[in-house]
Design a protein with these regions (language model features):
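N-terminal core-binding DNA-recognition domain of tyrosine recombinases/integrases
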Residues: 1-12, 25-30, 65, 93, ...
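Catalytic-site neighborhood detector that most strongly recognizes the C-terminal catalytic loop/helix
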Residues: 15, 71-72, 160, 165-185
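C-terminal catalytic core of tyrosine-transesterase DNA break-rejoin enzymes
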Residues: 41, 45, 139-163, 170
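Short, charged phosphate-coordinating catalytic segments
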Residues: 43-63
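Flexible interdomain linker/hinge and immediately adjacent N-terminus
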Residues: 1-23, 72, 103-108
Length: 201
């Protein structure tokens, strides 16, 4: 069966961009919601699932890494240096001595519905389309950013905790516009330059 263009190239209005990610983080800080800003930065810089935020604990900050338990497997993620610094500042400021860092007013770890609701509200203030913000949107952005730098899908699959690389491929699909930009950079069509007298010898 043939594939539609939507299946080959994801819609541009469905994936959050780095610029929009920055707008969300900056807006959260400006609103005084440091917890939400740090949640977004943690998701964006580590690629973890929202459901795995509970494993980001005060204790894990001592080692600069966290062990994530999911579906009977353990995955170790490392904290970027800057994230580690600001998380340590945050727990000190909020007097969080142990356990999960991102908690509700009742002291429970934030869950998927909590975070999704907060992000949707933030979108309106930041001027970012709500359609682009869904539970895995920051994870997708992390995957695309990591792959652009590392260009190693097997390593990315390990970082994301995917048992199949086929799942990882979904995360790093480029839009039609990005793909066309890459094709243009290849400069494999020589006709115009030849007609303009480009010396090929």
């Amino acid at each position: 069966p043939s594939c539609s263009s939507e299946e080959i190239f994801p819609a541009e209005n469905k994936e959050i961009t780095m610029h929009e990610y920055e707008k969300l983080v900056k807006t959260a800080y400006k609103k005084g919601d440091k917890r939400l800003a740090l949640i977004i930065e943690t998701l964006g810089s580590t690629g973890i699932r929202i459901s795995e935020l509970r494993h980001i604990t005060v204790e894990s900050l001592k080692y600069g890494m966290a062990d994530l338990h999911n579906k009977g497997k353990v995955r170790r993620i490392l904290y970027p240096s800057e994230l580690l610094r600001i998380l340590r500042e945050y727990v000190k400021e909020k007097h969080i001595c142990s356990g999960s860092i991102f908690i509700t007013s009742k002291g429970n770890p934030v869950n998927r519905s909590n975070v999704w609701r907060m992000m949707k509200n933030l979108c309106r203030d930041a001027g970012v389309s709500e359609e682009k913000v869904y539970p895995h949107s920051m994870r997708h952005l992390f995957a695309r950013s990591f792959y652009k730098i590392k260009n190693d899908i097997a390593k990315l699959a390990d970082v994301l905790g995917h048992s199949s690389i086929d799942t990882t491929r979904i995360y790093i699909k480029t839009t039609g516009k990005e793909h066309k930009r890459q094709l243009n950079k290849m400069k494999m069509v020589l006709g115009t330059r030849l007609r303009e007298g480009w010396d090929v010898m």
